[in-house]
Amino acid sequence: MSGIVIAIVVLTILALVFGVLLGFAAEKFKVEGNPLVDQVEALLPQTQCGQCGYPGCRPYAEAIANGDKINKCPPGGTATMEKIADLVGVDPEPLNATEAVQEKKVAFIREDECIGCTKCIQACPVDAILGSGKLMHTVITDYCTGCDLCVAPCPVDCIDMLPIEQTTKTWDWQLNAIPVKQVQEEPQC
C-alpha cells in the first residue's frame, strides 16, 4: 500500500475513535438546564426591551427562577405576572410603580421629519417599524409594545410615544379577573 492510503486509513480510524469518545463525553457530562427558566421565558412577551432591568427576557426568566420579583415586566402586564405567579407558586403582586405603565403607548413617527436613517428600525426589538434607508418609516401599532427604545436613537427626534385610543379592540377586558361562583343544583321533588 502506498503511504497516502495508509495515512488516509489511519486518519479515518482516529476520527472515528475521537468522534465516539466525544459523543460519549457529551452524553456523560451533559449539563441540564432549569426547566422552570424555559417555562417562565415562554410566558414572557419576548420584546427584549430591558424595562425589567435585565438585557432580555431570558435573563429575567433566569432571575425569576432564582427568586427575583415577578412584577417587573410592563409589556407583559398584570396577566403575564399572574401566570408567572401561578407557575412559580408565589402570590401575585401589583406591577412595581417604577415599572408599571400608566397607559399603553405606541411609537408614532412624524413621517415628514423622518430622514430614513434606520436607527429606530435597528433599535426596535419586535420589528414594529417599517422602512428602509433614506425613505420614510412608519410604525405598525399592533406590533408596537411601547418599550420606548426607538425614541433615543432618532437623530432628528421625530418619534413620539402616543397613548392608544381605547376601543373594543384595545380595551383590557380582564376576563380572567371575573369571579365565577360554582352553584350546586338542588334536587327537585
Swiss-Prot record:
Gene3D superfamilies: 3.30.70.20, Electron transport complex subunit B, putative Fe-S cluster. It comes from Shewanella piezotolerans (strain WP3 / JCM 13877). Residues 105-134, 135-164 form the 4Fe-4S ferredoxin-type domain. Keywords: 4Fe-4S, Cell inner membrane, Cell membrane, Electron transport, Iron, Iron-sulfur, Membrane, Metal-binding, Repeat, Translocase, Transport. Residues 1-26 are annotated as: Hydrophobic. It is found in: Cell inner membrane. Its cofactor is [4Fe-4S] cluster. [4Fe-4S] cluster 2 binds at residues 114, 117, 120, 154. This is Ion-translocating oxidoreductase complex subunit B. Part of a membrane-bound complex that couples electron transfer with translocation of ions across the membrane. The complex is composed of six subunits: RnfA, RnfB, RnfC, RnfD, RnfE and RnfG. GO terms for molecular function: 4 iron, 4 sulfur cluster binding; electron transfer activity; metal ion binding.
